[in-house]
């Protein structure tokens, strides 16, 4: 079963990792704050995050046209593009979870999505420096 389906914690971690560059580039901290405060609003907040991911993915694609060999841009594109699969599975798991587990998963997701990483820092330099 584990080979077919990710563990909850692993899914939350991967979803957060996928959305992290978009959150930081667009300073979408308010979306994560609202999600953490009101976990029951996860469908609306995940939809907002999806729109932000699309915007940042388009920015990354535009920059890749000028710099197609840049590894950070390629990694960022792959990470952002994976969001669709992760958010679908995350929404399904949140729907299936009881209230207590849903709150735990949502807050863990928010904490992980807020934590910066090396790729996000590098991507910020690349895209904000143009």
UniProtKB/Swiss-Prot annotation:
Q: What induces it?
A: Repressed by 5 J/m2 ultraviolet light and 50 mM NaCl, slightly induced by 20 J/m2 ultraviolet light, 100 and 150 mM Nacl. Member of the csa5-cas7-cas5a-cas3-cas3'-cas8a2 operon.
Any single GO BP term: defense response to virus
> Which superkingdom heads the taxonomic lineage of this protein's source?
Archaea
Keyword annotations of the record:
Antiviral defense
**How would you summarize the oligomeric state and partners of this protein?**
Can form a Cascade complex with Cas7, Cas5a, Cas3, Cas3' and Cas8a2.
Q: What does this protein do?
A: CRISPR (clustered regularly interspaced short palindromic repeat) is an adaptive immune system that provides protection against mobile genetic elements (viruses, transposable elements and conjugative plasmids). CRISPR clusters contain spacers, sequences complementary to antecedent mobile elements, and target invading nucleic acids. CRISPR clusters are transcribed and processed into CRISPR RNA (crRNA).
Q: Any idea what this protein is called?
A: CRISPR system associated protein Csa5
């Amino acid at each position: 079963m584990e080979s077919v389906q990710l563990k909850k914690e692993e899914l939350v971690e991967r979803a957060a990792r996928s959305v992290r560059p978009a959150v930081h580039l667009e300073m979408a901290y308010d979306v994560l704050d609202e999600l953490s405060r009101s976990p029951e609003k996860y469908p609306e907040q995940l939809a907002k995050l999806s729109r932000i991911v699309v915007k940042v993915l388009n920015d990354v694609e535009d920059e890749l046209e000028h710099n197609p060999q840049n590894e950070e841009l390629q990694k960022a594109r792959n990470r952002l593009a994976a969001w669709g699969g992760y958010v679908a599975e995350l929404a399904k798991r949140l729907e299936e979870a009881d209230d207590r587990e849903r709150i735990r998963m949502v807050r863990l997701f928010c904490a992980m999505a807020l934590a910066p990483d090396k790729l996000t820092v590098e991507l910020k330099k690349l895209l904000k420096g143009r």
